[in-house]
Amino acid sequence: MLLPLIILWPVVFKCSFASLSDPENWNCPEVSPSGKGSPACVGPAPFLIFSHGISIFRIDLEGTNHEQLVADAGVSVIMDFHYNKERIYWVDPERQLLQRVFLNGTRQERVCNIEKNVSGMAINWINEELIWSNQQEGIITVTDMKGNNSRVLLRALNYPANVAIDPIERFIFWSSEVAVAGSLHRADLNGVEEKILLQTSERITAVSLDVLDKQLFWIQYSRDGSNSHIYSCNYDGGSVHLSKHLTQHNFFAMSLFGNQIFYSTWKKKTIWIANKHSGKDMVRINLDSSFVPPGGIKVVHPLLQPKAESGTWAPDQKLCKWKQGNCRGSTCGQDSKSYSCTCAEGYTLSQDGKYCEDVNECAFWNHGCTLGCENIPGSYYCTCPVGFILLPDGKRCHQLIACPSNTSKCSHDCVLTSDGPICFCPEGSVLEADGKTCSGCSSPDNGGCSQLCLPLSPVSWECGCFPGYDLQLDKQSCAASGPQPFLLFANSQDIRHMHFDGTDYGTLLSQQMGMVFALDHDPVENKIYFAHTALKWIERANMDGSQRERLIEEGVDVPEGLAIDWIDRKFYWTDSGKSLIEGSDLNGKHREIIIKEDISQPRGIAVHPMAKRLFWTDMGINPRIESSSLQGIGRLVIASSDLVWPSGITIDYVTDKLYWCDTKLSVIEMANLDGSKRQRLAQNDVGHPFAMAVFEDHVWFSDWTMPSIIRVDKRTGKNRVRLRGSMLKPSSLVVVHPLAKPGAQPCLYQNGGCEHICKERFGTAQCLCREGFVKAPDGKMCLALNGHQIPAVGSEADLSNHVTPGDVLPRSEGFEDNITESQHMLVAEIMVSDADDCAPVGCSTWAECVSEGENATCQCLKGFTGDGKLCFDIDECEMGITICPPTSSKCVNTEGGYVCQCSEGYRGDGIHCLDINECQLGMHTCGENATCTNMEGNYTCMCAGSLSEPGQICADSTPPSHPMEDSHYSVRNGYRECPSSYDGYCLYNGVCMYIEAVDRYACNCVFGYVGERCQHRDLKWELRHAGQGRQRQVAAVAVGVVVLVLLLLLGLGGAHCYRTKKLSSKNLKNPYEEPSREGSSSRPSDSEARMASFPQPWFVVIKEHQNLRNGSQPMALKDGESADVSQFSSPEPGSVKRTSWRNEHQLYKDTEQGCCTPPSSNRGTGSQSMEQSFSVPSYEAQPIALGVEKPQSLLSAKPLLQQRAPDPPHQMKLIQ
């Protein structure tokens, strides 16, 4: 188990190196001979220190923070640095002094006096020693950092110079010169094992070490001094390599870091940066004008002075390091003889002497707070209750009594105290020394934080970053994580790319471009969109320049601005010739006019997809900055005053700030999205700004006065840096990075390139594999675990789920292979100041300044002619020097070139024109049953062997077929299947179809998804179906309740029937069983006889009313009639009202229809027996069913009603 850990332990702590172009998010170089790697760790930004004249300067690798550290360092300076001590040490041979200063330029002091003829110096940062060589005495001396305890390390050397050491490997290197021969030497730090690495007949003038790759570099001059070269070898003197591509003739000094070499030359006041292996990716840092070139150069970074491994420390240091293992969360005190653990202020050592514990200052009442104290790790702060504020001393609380008027001009607020009015600050801010200004989160500089300022206490705060950004070591700046960002910009005749520090400067598209001012990038499909002002069309292409396709070819006049809505998948452009703003989807379909009223000369345009707003500049009669919704409604004027030619415009999506520039006024301004808090960032020193971009902490804009790209701080407008290099009219700047356009979904396009699962994280596509698979080495495909060899740990295959580096690249993998060696290599120049050799020459806009030494000349660009100061366009079409095919195209002249405009029926790339097969593509107008035949530049329609006109319908010779409705056809109801090239166009199982009526491809989305490509989840559908689900649940519950109630009612009804039946069987007697009490022997009436003649059973339904009175009695009726029982005491003839039995409650036949059935016995009859047998309960409005068999007379029911009170009429029906 321990063996793999031991093997992998060095790998875990190695950081690989890819690039050094981001000043705030630097990748740590990998310690390997190849010098190649991938971004893996983050370190502080490196910077340069160099001598220039008699001063020492520092500058960032991007040209920022150029400042003087030492004003009078001496004429010939030999220097080195100690990173942990943050010091620069230098030797002034003329004054014979060793001096030092902090890296920030403070506390300059003399260390000691030294002897004459010092020819080289280096610092041993591990043993805390200074080593220098004396060329005349032939010795190398070692002293401590104060210049004391000197001892000679090496003697009897031949003119030693250019000392360099590697304390990790414990080697010292130096150069010597004897007669006409030069040589390189090596020894260990004990002064033994001296070895000659190389001997040459030429002079060696400078030596530098690459401590990361363990390489030795040196500058070698020819004897006559006419040329020089840079060589390298390993620490043993083997593998000597000549850097052929570094073609400068007068190398002076150099330094190395990672994959780059930094060097200066004798004749130019510049510092060059190039790839140390190939000599390419050259960048020139142009310094202030001076009559001397930069002298010694050193790159400052902690990786250039790494910590030592075990075995390289001094004995005392070893002991402290061994003791340090017992100190947890503390430090080892090296000044103590016991080498015990020590703790920082605010902590105390634990009883076992190994831990540092926090001291609770609030518990000891020695904090000095008047009302409240809050302990925090390592410190504390005072608090105040509600209604009180903490005074600036941070201890006392005072009741909040506002000053009558803010006469003290406090930046925040004022409180009235016994000592008078005092300014105070909100939580997270402190009062400055002036007693009025607050610094912290409430200050204009946001507490020095580039993004978030987070209050920690009333007097402290810390900086934070938005998701996707990393806080840098300065604890203030935020840098974007992920791949290295770069710039895209239209350069009039071509499209170029460049990293922020000027490296990787090249051309992306250059063939048949015409004039291009409008450009933008789609991060989802990784394509660029650009508009031609001369050719009057809009194109798009891949990032490697391939697959160019025209989107808008008609109705375009002067498109000068273009913006991509990467979320809603549309793009918008300004047309100053037609004075309108238009938009369409990313395929050029569904074109619509957005703004056409009250607009004069629109130029720059930007879109905010999250805010659903468009922003644009208008350079016309009423110059202004405006915005509207994406549909062109809700227009809002952002700015209309102090504007002349507002040109470029851009949006900071992190802070929701709007930036624009005015070409005529030469100003850069910013404001909120609604136009509030408008302020100027820069003025007068920005040339003629044309286009803008913003990312991280900087604003980029192009300058047409001195064709270049300038960068300033986006909050202050300071730290101006100019990038230039053979530029014409740079415009439409675009920053390419996943976080530059937040919210992009790269997984929407071709599943992000992933074979299985694609997940988006901060704008990048992360590929995952399903269970049972692992990622292939390309990071996109998946390999099955069964039957495939899984790459071993440490191989090139990344089996994790992290995003692979380089997902966003300025070019495709094979782009460099297509570049011929003869292609001109672009060289970017970082200009610290605007003073350069080309400034007084005054080259034409269409010319390039070529500076060689003290001379500078102007050369007209390709496609132009002149003396360089005046250049004129060459009309290639008129001169007949084009290659446009005359039969299929027309030559159109552009500035610096030409374009072959294809004739109707042809399509091309601007040079070549190919015939369009209208028949195959379905672009013909042949009628039904006609045969389309393609021709060169045209097509014909044939009807049964005879020629027909386009649109003519041919007679059908075959009977029409009637397909079944459920059959599948490629064309139905104006819809047609999409071609195979559109596979994957519709996402989430959507079905692609082509709608002929509108000439557009559309997606039929499955339920739950919406959007042009079904890329969005339908939240309304989800909410609607969630509501329907809840309704269905409620309905199910309601149905269940109803069923239960019905079952309960049925149970109650059955119980009631059973009880009624039981009571009837006990209490009711058959009227036919007992004789009449009155002894009546009268003959039954006709109706009674008629009723008695029926053998089937009968039952009576009696409907009672509330006002049924005593004495009411039912009447004997004929079959099928009803009687109204009126208010009477004895039956009277003619008092019965007969009605139809169908309209009232009835006397029903057939016992199965009743609620209950009487006994079926057939016994004696008579009214007397009925009177004694029936008992009618007094239920209100309730029908009562009574079963009888062959009743003789209904008059026998009279006794049943004699005891009741009089009621309203009662109706009965008798039905057979």
Curated annotation (Swiss-Prot):
Q: Using the record's annotation, list all stretches that form the EGF-like domain.
A: 316-357, 358-398, 399-439, 437-479, 743-783, 834-872, 873-914, 915-955, 974-1015
Q: Which cysteines are joined by disulfide bonds?
A: 320-332, 327-341, 343-356, 362-373, 369-382, 384-397, 403-414, 410-423, 425-438, 441-453, 449-463, 465-478, 747-758, 754-767, 769-782, 838-849, 843-858, 860-871, 877-891, 884-900, 902-913, 919-932, 926-941, 943-954, 978-992, 986-1003, 1005-1014
Q: Where is this region: Disordered?
A: 1068-1089, 1111-1139, 1151-1177, 1197-1216
Domain of life from the UniProt record:
Eukaryota
Q: Where is the signal peptide?
A: 1-18
Q: Where are the LDL-receptor class B repeats?
A: 86-127, 128-169, 170-213, 214-260, 485-525, 526-568, 569-611, 612-655, 656-698
Membrane topology per the record?
Answer: Single-pass type I membrane protein
Q: Which Pfam families match?
A: cEGF, EGF, EGF_CA, FXa_inhibition, Ldl_recept_b
Q: What is this protein called?
A: Pro-epidermal growth factor
Q: Which organism is it from?
A: Canis lupus familiaris
